[in-house]
Structures are given as C-alpha cells and as structure tokens.
Amino acid sequence: VTVVDDETEFKDLYTTITPNTFYANKLGDDAWVLNLPTKQVYNGKDIKVNPKNQRIYYDMPSDSTLVFIDMADADYQLLQNYSALSSAEQKALKNKVTTNKVRYNLSQDHVITVRSYAGTIKQYTLYCLIYPEFKTVTVNGVKGVLTRDAFNQDHQIYTFTLPAGTDVANAKIEYTLDGTGTFMIDGTEVVSGTTTNLAADKLSIERSSDANAQAKAVSNVEFVFKFQ
C-alpha cells in the first residue's frame, strides 16, 4: 500500500491576542474568514486590539506541507515548477515558508498558498474583518452605554436608562456605525431615525467584505433597558 501525502486543507487558522485566541471560519472550498473585535476585555478593562501587527498560526495535518502567506508572483511561478528546481532553488523557496515569527495586518485580506508533499497546490483567501459596532446610538434621545462580553467577542450589550413608561416596542433609534455595516432587526435593515420595535429577539450589525459579500463579521447586539 502506497500512502500519498497530499494534504492541502487546514485544520485551523487562527491568531492569538492576549488573552484570547481568534479562530477563522472556513468559507466554501477556498476561503477563510477571521473576525476580530475593536476592543477586548482583559483584567476587567476594555483593551484596544491592534490588528495591524499580529501573527497567523495554522494547524495542518502534515508537516511536509509548505505554507506561504502573500507569496510573490515570481515565487508562485517557481512553486508551480517545484519538482524541476535544483535542490538549492528548492531550499531557497522553502526558506520563504511562513513562520509564526512574521506579523501581518489583520485588518486586510491575505492570500495563502499551500503545496502538499505530493505537489498539489491550492490557494486560499483569508478575509479579515473587524466586528462592527455603534459609534453612537440613542433610543428616544437617550445614549446607550456599551458593555463588552469577555467570553463572546461578537456579543455587544448596550444599556439605555429610559423614563418610566417608555414603550421600547415603538421607540426611535438613531445611530452611527464605526465603519461600513448594516444594523438589522430580525433580519431586516433598520436605518437611523426609524421608529421600531427595539424589544425584538434578534438584533445585529453586519459587515461584509468588499471583495466577497459572503465573507462577513456579524455582531450580535443586545439592548438592555432600565427605567427610572
């Protein structure tokens, strides 16, 4: 029995930013999506995340698989003819294999090239998206206060202290976002200035990649209302 080492599929793609590890999710056959928060809770404080200087880690079933991130076109041409290269040329190319010492800007996308020991080459796009959040948000003119979830980075809790008797099922929401995105209630877009049911079950802010609309960062929003 001849076993051919032809592994080109990642088990995991991730980055670690103390105190959390952020795992990418597979999208289709040739893409992954990595979402990061703007801030994360660490020792009880909201700490700003710097996505522009982070490492990319991966788990691959075979140690013989070569992995390159943002490979130069000239090197990709060499990789396609790897078997025909001299041992010195092969070694030079292997020296460009990605290691966890290299840091990347995880606010932008990356192309990951994989070559199995058997010679199969596959390319993936790693879409990097920051979870969207409200820059400002008010309900009937009252500002919401954001509390971050230390264990669920996509969960954002906004607390509003409203006058007693306020009907939150028929309230006016005004907001700005911290970038591109769409505020949704039960799957329907709600624009700023709308009077609507803010006691609905599913509130979210969705951000899609400009390069691939299927690549998204979705923030699960919770509104907490206090009355006085």
Feature locations, PLM:
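Beta-rich interaction/scaffold domains
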Residues: 1-228
